[in-house]
């Protein structure tokens, strides 16, 4: 099923990650809607299934960004809500995601 099948009525995607981001040792596309943060992936070759992690924006009470590593830096965003979601990837891809989440949470 495509992501659109999992969106709520009148829910609009405001940001989509350019490349997959790592969360819990799995790769996901990240979407920020006007209501939720959604991590979405299609898994399997023959028996396809959807893998979704979702957090309501109103439940998020903290967003943290950090970079580590030399010479190859890795960026991490920690989103604190009902649980903590730690997403990793290259800084050039993670920073725009951080700013998008931060602007939607502070909205």
Residue ranges and their predicted role:
Residues 45-49, 64-77:
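Short acidic, Gly/Pro-enriched loop/turn segments at secondary-structure junctions
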Residues 33, 77-81:
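Active-site beta-strand termini and strand-to-loop segments that position acidic
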């Amino acid at each position: 099923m495509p992501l659109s099948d999992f969106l709520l009525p009148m829910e609009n995607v405001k940001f989509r990650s350019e490349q997959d981001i790592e969360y819990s040792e799995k790769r996901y596309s990240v979407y920020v809607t006007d209501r939720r943060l959604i991590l979405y992936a299609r898994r399997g070759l023959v028996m396809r299934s959807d893998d979704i992690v979702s957090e309501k924006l109103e439940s998020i009470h903290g967003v943290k960004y950090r970079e580590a590593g030399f010479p190859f830096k890795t960026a991490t965003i920690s989103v604190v809500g009902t649980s903590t979601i730690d997403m990793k990837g290259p800084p050039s891809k993670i920073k725009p995601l951080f700013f998008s989440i931060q602007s939607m949470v502070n909205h």
